[in-house]
Structures are given as structure tokens and as C-alpha cells.
Amino acid sequence: MDFTTLQNDFTNDYQKALIANNEFLEAKKYYNGNQLPQDVLNIILERGQTPIIENMFKVIVNKILGYKIESISEIRLSPKQEEDRALSDLLNSLLQVFIQQENYDKSMIERDKNLLIGGLGVIQLWVSQDKDKNVEIEIKAIKPESFVIDYFSTDKNALDARRFHKMLEVSEQEALLLFGDSVIVNYSNVNHERIASVIESWYKEYNEETQSYEWNRYLWNRNTGIYKSEKKPFKNGACPFIVSKLYTDELNNYYGLFRDIKPMQDFINYAENRMGNMMGSFKAMFEEDAVVDVAEFVETMSLDNAIAKVRPNALKDHKIQFMNNQADLSALSQKAEQKRQLLRLLAGLNDESLGMAVNRQSGVAIAQRKESGLMGLQTFLKATDDMDRLIFRLAVSFICEYFTKEQVFKIVDKKLGDRYFKINSNDDNKIRPLKFDLILKSQLKTESRDEKWYNWNELLKILAPIRPDLVPSLVPLMLNDMDSPITNDVLEAIQNANALQQQNAEANAPYNQQIQALQIQKLQAEIMELQAKAHKYAEQGALSQTTNESEKINQAVAITEMQQQNANNANNEESNNKPKKKLKTSDKTTWRKYPSAQNLDY
């Protein structure tokens, strides 16, 4: 890459981005309250009036950023191969280390603010090493006004860009560390300090050896030339910048909320300052012969407490008339309120989502209007989610390429507390490249504390009769969900109660064992008693059955003998005088004819 090409490309890209950059700078001025033009401000100050600025733009931006900061985000890496599951768990832990670094939240909030106000958010990831060669991935939000994108790029995330330019201002010491003593750097004096203006350009160029595209870095100055060039600064040949555009117009210029809100904001400021002037002013018309001295009359009537002398019959003949501005004030106030409502609609919010509703409605109606009022934020949330996926994908790529040394990391887990883990100490925790999918879920926290309390109460009412053992463990979750300041105290109280219960259980363990042994012996005795009774009843049943069978046999024998005896009596009449033979039963009693009279003596 030669110096002339760098100059021409930067000039073309910068001129194309100049409109969007100027709009972004103006949006920052409006956000910080500098909304009145200088000529209007001078007129207001000459009148002795206090400038009035109703910064609805800042209210809306801060409200949306508040919703975004409080949103719930979950990032998870899912491997495409089953054998990479253990490695993916390790990479998920390293992503948590990346998220929990001190500069992460600050950079992401700055990114969200720039994206929302001006329509462009830029994040830079960089790989750094300490003196022990421990690797760390740094994150930083880049100012959009100092960042230039390839003017041919049309993608929302600039994935089709061929080059990026970042304008830097570095001190003399930083320049020496960056370029060394052998490079002549062009400095300028700013506030008695030598500052070097440097342009950092990244180009996507084709490598003939690897037959693939890679990003190369060039550090140069528009007047001096190229200070330093680096071929493929990163091992994976990636570019460290992640870009997101909120909206783009027909000329491919990015923009944010400011473009739609600015006309309404200007009218509101104009109306407020105009009404402030009209409330303290009046219009007077008088005939020349109605006053003694015109100059004195005008000067006197301009005072708050004025006593002026007029000619006789001047008031009676209505030669002096005062006109107020009440009608104009009402019309101007009504138009200003209409512009406020239109401004909220353009921002995608309503009074409920802004926390400005004063109408009396049910809780369900307010919740529904609040949810519908946040639907306008989906474009912004979708842009940030897509950008977050690209950030985490690049971070994982850097981790797989540079985390080759044995290191120990610490992450803070809400459930497990501080947790330490080691990488590259053995084959099981060795970091290596893999194919993966990123799953990112984000959800806005729209429920108020009262709504959460109501939902948790309903859930506890359902679970208490079914699973009462789960209720104590759900109480800390409920308090944590409602951001209660006593969550830690409740957790400590539950842990103390569980510890005391455990101590009592250990102290009563011998007595409980004795009681359990006695209960086992009692159960064994009861079982033996039941078995004995069952055996007794079984023997009695068998005996009764045997007796019944014997009775049947004896009855049959007796009947046979009687039939034989009757036959003998017919042949031998003398047998009538002989005593009859008694029938015997099994229990040696006289047999009776009646079935129910067996074994009975009468």
C-alpha cells in the first residue's frame, strides 16, 4: 500500500462521512443542552430574559439507555461437534471473564449511547500481554466522529467494508513507544504539549501465499507519510473493529434518533422562550395628543411598577389601549404540547414507558400500554444484539488463537461465589479453535416491583400446597428478582437456620438411631405376631376340613350298616328283640340324623 492511495482513499471516505459526522456532533450538543443558536441566545439575553431549554431529547435517550442497561442478557456458546462440549464450557467461562472486566460495561454503555444518538456504534477489541505473557482481551468504544468507514459499504454492520480509518491524537511519549526513535513524527503544540496526529487505516487485502483475505494495518500522517505498516497484525487475520448503524438514509448516510427529534425539539424551545417573552410583555397603542411626553410615557410604562401622566379625557375617550397576549399564549402552548406528543411517537415511546403518565387506569391497562410503548425500541435492540454477537464471535476467535499459555482466571458467580479455573494445564482444558454457534438472548425488564411481587405471590400460592419444600428456596430468588436490598440478609438468615438445623440433627443423631432401632424391633415383633396368627388360623382351617371329611365317611358307613340291618331284620324276626347297635361318630358320640347336630350331645 503506497502513501498516495492512502491519502486518496481517506479523502474520499472522509468527505462522504462528513455529513453524518457533523450531524452526530450536533446531536451531542443537543444532548448536552446546547440547543439554542447563538443569534437567538443573544436576543434572549439582550431582553434580560432567561433562556429556556426543555431537553426532551436527553430525557428520551436516557430513558431508552436505562431500559437497555437494566435488560437481561445471556450469551452461550454451543459447539457443532459433540466432542467439543467440554471445550465449549471452558470458552463460556472465558467469555464470562471477558464480560466481567472493568471496562466492559462502560464501553458497551458508550456504544449504546453513540448508536442511539448519532446512529453509529464502534467497538474495538485488542489483544494485550503483560510482563508474564498473560493474555487479555481489551474492549474500547471508539468515538464515531473520529472513525471513517469505506464509503462503498452498505451493510448495517459494515461487513462488506474494504477499509476503516481511525483518527488519533497521541502524545509524544505514546508516539515514541509506538514508532520508536528512528521514525520522524510530525508534532503540533496543543496547550503547551506536543501532540501527533496519526491516522490508523486498516485494509482488507488478498494474500497470494495463503490465498485468502487478511486485514493489514497502516499508521500514517497526511503531511509526513507512512509511519508504520503491519502485515496481518492478528494471527487470525481479523479486523479489531465491530461496527453497527442504527438507520441509513437514501444517500447511505447513517443517522440516529436526533434527525427525527430535532425539528420537534427546536419548536418546543422556540415556543417556551416565546411564551416566556410574551408573558412579561404587552402591546400599547396611544394617540399622540393623549400623553404629555411620548418618550417619558414609553420609558415609564416599560417598568414593572409604572405610574404615568396622561392628558385629560385620554382614558375616557379610549385614546390609550393595552392589548395582552393571552390568545397567542394559549395557541402557542397547545402547539407545543402537540409537538411533545409527536416527539414521543417518533422516539417509539409513550407516557407510560417514559414514566410521565398521569391518567388513572388499572394496573393491567398500564402494563399493556407500557409494553406497547416499548415496541418502538425493537430496532435499536436488534441492532445492539447483532453487534454483540459479532463482538463475542471475534472475542472467541482471539481466545482460540492467543490463549495458548497456562493461565488461571477468576469469575464471580452469583450462585457459587468466586470461582477459579485453569486453562492449558492438560489436554482436557487446552484451548484450540473449534466451530460453534453463538446464542444470545436479551430481554427488557419492564415489570415494576409491585407487578413482580404480585406474580411471585401467585406462583407461591400455586406451589405451596403442592411442593411446600420448595417455598424456602424460592424466597431468595423472589427478593433478587425484585432487586431487594435485604436479599443478602435473607440468604444469610436462611443459611444460619439451615446450619442450626444441621447441628441439632447431628447432636440428636445417637438418640435418633436408638429410637429407630426400637422402632425396627417393634415392627419385627409385630410381623412375627402376625405370622404366628396366620399359621394358627391356617392350622385351624386344615383341622376343620379334616373333621368334615371324616364326618362324611362315617355317615356313609352308618347308612350302609343300617341298610344291611334292615335287610337282616326282614329275614330274621327275632332280631327285633335284640338291642340296636349304636352308630358312632368320629368323636365317639351317637350319630344323629341332623347335619347341624354333629359333634353335639343332647
From Swiss-Prot:
Name by which UniProt lists this protein: Portal protein
Taxonomic classification: Viruses, Duplodnaviria, Heunggongvirae, Uroviricota, Caudoviricetes
Domain of life, source organism: Viruses
Primary site of residence: virion
CC terms in the record's Gene Ontology section: viral capsid
GO biological process: symbiont genome ejection through host cell envelope, short tail mechanism
The protein's assembly and partners: Homododecamer.
Localization per record: Virion
Coiled coil (UniProt feature): 324-352, 486-542
Keyword Nucleus: no
